[in-house]
Regions:
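Alpha-helical transmembrane segments in multi-pass membrane proteins
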Residues: 29, 33, 38, 42, ...
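C-terminal ends of transmembrane helices
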Residues: 42-45, 123-134, 161-168, 213-215
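Interfacial segments of multi-pass membrane proteins
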Residues: 68-72, 94-98, 120, 138-168, ...
Length: 237
């Protein structure tokens, strides 16, 4: 009895240690991804270009679209590359890092760990601690995570985005519809095998719509800026 009781206690202790290790690894990697996500591409480019802050210009959003409107193509390209890169690092590198002391817990689902890190980077982009929690709308960083999670889906999303953009001229609308098309595609083509990825895409599709709520209001009021040069069907004078 004493031997059995001792073995039971040992197993319980090991389980507790394993649970703590799991939570520590998840927590640290979530925070690392969030901190990386909090690095705003527009702020980095602004410092490199003499202290430009696009949050005080145009729509006030520190994302690629406002960067393009206010600073031009090269500046906007730099912003997008940095913001997409954050998602690539969070989803592609952070989950595989072996942490000092903590190590790597093989009991953790690598899929859920990767999704955890990917989500943290998008949250960091929208609510960056380095910039008083005033960030972008999350689309570029979400794309970066999807390049790692499901690269084949990116071409489909890009086609949807371009299609809506040339029909409407609204970048925000194109981004929202492309985001919503991701879980639809996965529901039709990949369920039930890719359920975690479907949940991730469905949650962040709604999240992207939420972060674009000001665009929705402006479109309803007729005040949203439209890129008429990219529209295929546009009125000609």
């Amino acid at each position: 009895m004493l031997v059995q009781y001792g073995c039971y206690n040992a197993r319980q202790s090991l389980c507790k240690i394993g649970t703590v290790t799991l939570m520590v690894e998840l927590g640290i990697k979530f925070l690392l991804s969030y901190f990386i996500g909090s690095i705003m591409g527009s702020m980095v480019m602004g410092k490199l270009c003499g202290g430009v802050d696009i949050r005080t210009m145009g729509s006030g959003n520190p994302g690629g679209t406002n960067a393009l409107r206010t600073q031009g193509g090269l500046f906007a390209l730099g912003v997008v590359v940095i913001d997409v890169g954050k998602g690539l690092i969070a989803a592609g590198i952070i989950p595989g890092i072996e942490l000092p002391i903590v190590g790597t817990d093989l009991e953790i689902s690598r899929t859920w760990l990767t999704l955890n890190c990917a989500a943290a980077s998008v949250i960091g982009h929208v609510w960056p601690m380095w910039h008083k929690f005033h960030g972008g709308k999350g689309a570029s960083t979400l794309v970066g995570t999807l390049i790692i999670l499901t690269p084949g889906l990116i071409a489909c999303l890009l086609l949807v985005w371009l299609w809506v953009l040339v029909l409407s001229g609204y970048v925000g609308l194109a981004t929202m519809i492309a985001s919503l098309s991701a879980p639809v595609y996965l529901a039709v083509m990949r369920l039930p095998s890719d359920q975690p990825l479907f949940i991730y895409c469905a949650m962040f599709a709604l999240y992207i719509v939420f972060t674009h709520r000001s665009n929705i209001r402006r479109m309803m009021d007729g005040a949203e800026l439209r890129n008429s040069r990219l529209m295929f069907f546009r009125r000609r004078n």
